[in-house]
Amino acid sequence: MRILGIDPGLRVTGFGIIDVSGHRLAYVASGVIRTPTADLATRLGTIFQGVSTIVREHAPDQSAIEKVFVNVNPQSTLLLGQARGAAICGLVAGGLPVAEYTALQLKQAVVGYGRATKTQMQEMVTRLLNLSGQPGSDAADALGMAICHAHGGNTLSTLGGLAPALAKKGLRVRRGRLVG
């Protein structure tokens, strides 16, 4: 199975592609989509076209993208949400299912600690994929998103969807974990 991970951003959108066979992960490609210093519509179009091209060239089976977090600056949050929307449109236009994970879920799945630093993420991605060099932070986050989806991301999403049934049994999902 081939998974495309996306780390959305208005200026720089990271992408990472891995192949998964059982518990084995193999690096395929990674990089960034840089948008020009231009109006918002042009930047969003660049993200959409870039993601669409990656989907066409690498033919992933599934995709995973980071959920928007609420920033201190509401305007920044809105802009990030629009960039994310453009990326999702590129994924959906390519016929891909889209899984969504929070930054906390991503870091927990890849590093084992939800408050991991960018450097820790880069190091773990490098080790997990046996890379010869360390990817940039945006590409590393995108590769991490693909790894998260491959290794338990599905479980985290499923647990979140089961929340109402779990609550009836006195259980809940907290930070991606089942707790009593």
Swiss-Prot record:
Catalysed reactions listed for this entry: Endonucleolytic cleavage at a junction such as a reciprocal single-stranded crossover between two homologous DNA duplexes (Holliday junction)
Annotated residues for binding of Mg(2+) 1: 7, 138
EC number from the UniProt entry: 3.1.21.10
Pfam families: RuvC (PF02075)
Subcellular localization: Cytoplasm
Cofactor(s) this protein cannot do without: Mg(2+)
Domain of life: Bacteria
Main subcellular location: cytoplasm
Residues that hold Mg(2+) 2 according to the record: 66
Gene3D superfamilies for this protein: Ribonuclease H-like superfamily/Ribonuclease H (3.30.420.10)
GO BP: DNA recombination; DNA repair
Molecular function as annotated in GO: crossover junction DNA endonuclease activity; DNA binding; magnesium ion binding
GO cellular component: cytoplasm; Holliday junction resolvase complex
Record-annotated active site: 7, 66, 138
Cofactor note: Binds 2 Mg(2+) ion per subunit.
SUPFAM superfamilies to which the protein is assigned, alphabetical: Ribonuclease H-like
Keywords assigned by UniProt, alphabetized: Cytoplasm, DNA damage, DNA recombination, DNA repair, DNA-binding, Endonuclease, Hydrolase, Magnesium, Metal-binding, Nuclease
Subunit structure: Homodimer which binds Holliday junction (HJ) DNA. The HJ becomes 2-fold symmetrical on binding to RuvC with unstacked arms; it has a different conformation from HJ DNA in complex with RuvA. In the full resolvosome a probable DNA-RuvA(4)-RuvB(12)-RuvC(2) complex forms which resolves the HJ.
Task of the protein: The RuvA-RuvB-RuvC complex processes Holliday junction (HJ) DNA during genetic recombination and DNA repair. Endonuclease that resolves HJ intermediates. Cleaves cruciform DNA by making single-stranded nicks across the HJ at symmetrical positions within the homologous arms, yielding a 5'-phosphate and a 3'-hydroxyl group; requires a central core of homology in the junction. The consensus cleavage sequence is 5'-(A/T)TT(C/G)-3'. Cleavage occurs on the 3'-side of the TT dinucleotide at the point of strand exchange.
Family affiliation: Belongs to the RuvC family.
Protein name: Crossover junction endodeoxyribonuclease RuvC
Biological classification of the source: Bacteria, Pseudomonadati, Pseudomonadota, Betaproteobacteria, Burkholderiales
Gene label: ruvC
